[in-house]
Regions:
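Active-site anion/phosphate-binding pocket segments in diverse small-molecule metabolic enzymes
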Residues: 2-21, 44, 71, 90, ...
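Active-site-proximal beta-alpha core segment in soluble small-molecule metabolic enzymes
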Residues: 2-7, 11-15, 19-22, 32-207
Length: 400
């Protein structure tokens, strides 16, 4: 179902799908020819909408990375046919769904392998998996430095009905300026792969480079890279050199719900943390931390009204916050920009990061009361309303 902007009188986020495509092409232009690309779309594509994002970038991808089997199933039900890899752990009770929906799990224990092999025999069909290695992230995977790590890998390769289609690991600190730990992970990964080869294993698809690795040129000598946060237009760390130009895909809008005049000495919001020093014109924005707007931005951040920065007054409430519009023209129902560009001004997640907002966390926490409205090169093409489960059956053009 495609809905116009008028359907959202309170707030909505805009996702420019062409920016996702541009980011992939920009990243690929810095990689060697033939490098395969995995788009990481876990956590509802970092809050952007998993099905809509996957549809927009599928032609550029060899693989989609998700965190849970439920996310993989959502993609399959959304018509995605590209291979899917679960980067996390699949509960044993959901193993059979891997066959039903043609989804690959991460494999790293004998118990997993034996159980999956037994199901493969019953199903009469092998299951493709990726071998997960822990080279220093400390999360999941075969601990490559432990005694027996290679033997475990060989055993998993030998299980009937199990096809090891890939081997991967994950950088933990590649966005740090000091690359000592990353270099150690690179050595461990390369050493494990070399040992497998020496023991007679023909290596499948190998990948270790994440967004930070891609942007820093680390781990890009292998067969594939996995792009997460950079796909959506952000660098993993504000301290990284901006070698690759990226476009932020998501912006956030709201409409003023109320405007009032207040005298000097008037308190605003909970705790009276802001008290006016003079007469002011104050507008209410009907968005709060219940929608994912960070409370830590109270009395700090600004929004754009007519392209003009207007500061937040007092604490951000669950559903509303107030701004100073004394110096700008503003009216009820006027659209304001909470995040993104308006005219020559921009509110960015890097600005918020200065006040303790972690960009990844914000995107993942953008609430389900905030509809996502999709554009393709500036044209409105679809809407996803999490509360109403309104997934677009197909993108439809609508003049903006």
């Amino acid at each position: 179902m495609c809905l116009g902007r008028e359907s959202y009188g309170r707030t909505y986020a805009v996702v420019e799908l062409s920016h996702l495509q541009d980011n992939i092409r920009e990243v690929k232009s810095h990689l060697r020819k033939g490098m395969q690309f995995c788009a990481v779309v876990k956590m509802d594509a970092y809050g952007h909408g998993i099905v809509e994002v996957a549809r927009a970038v599928e032609e550029e991808c060899a693989l989609f990375g998700v965190a849970t089997i439920e996310e993989g199933i959502i993609l399959r039900k959304g018509g995605i046919t590209t291979p899917i890899l679960i980067l996390g752990v699949v509960p044993k009770g959901q193993y059979r769904s891997l066959w039903h929906y043609d989804i690959m799990p991460s494999l790293f224990t004998k118990e997993q392998g034996v159980a999956l092999s037994a199901i493969a025999k019953k199903e009469g069909k092998s299951l493709a998996c990726h071998l997960a290695l822990d080279t220093g992230m400390g999360r999941i995977g075969i601990q490559v430095e432990h005694e027996g790590a290679v033997d475990l890998g060989l055993e998993l390769f030998s299980l009937p009905g199990i096809e090891i289609a890939g081997i991967f690991s994950h950088f933990s600190s590649c966005d740090d300026k000091d690359k000592t730990y990353t270099e150690m992970q690179e050595r461990r990964f390369a050493s494990y792969l070399q040992t497998l080869e020496e023991r007679g294993i023909k290596l499948p698809l190998c990948h270790i480079s994440n967004s930070a690795g891609i942007l820093e040129g680390r781990g890009v000598q292998y067969d594939m890279v996995r792009d997460g946060i950079a796909l959506y237009g952000l660098y993993p760390s504000k301290d990284m050199e901006r070698r690759v130009p990226l476009k932020m895909a998501l912006s956030w809008k709201a409409k003023i719900s109320h405007i009032k005049e207040i005298p000097a000495g008037e308190a605003i919001s909970y705790g009276a943390s802001f008290v006016s020093k003079e007469a002011m014109r104050v507008a209410t924005v009907p968005v709060g931390y219940g929608d994912g707007y960070p409370r830590v931005l109270s009395n700090k951040a600004k929004v754009l009204v007519g392209g003009n920065p207007c500061p937040i007054l007092g604490r951000v409430c669950m559903d509303q916050f107030m701004i100073d519009v004394s110096q700008v023209e503003a009216e009820v129902f006027q659209e304001v920009t909470l995040l993104g560009k308006e005219g020559e001004e921009e509110i960015s997640l890097y600005d918020w990061e200065e006040w303790g907002v972690f960009p990844y966390e914000f995107l993942c926490n953008l609430g389900n009361r905030v509809p996502r409205v999709y554009k393709m090169k500036g044209k409105w093409v679809g809407t996803y309303d999490p509360l109403s489960s309104l997934h677009s059956e197909e993108y439809q053009e609508e003049e903006s």
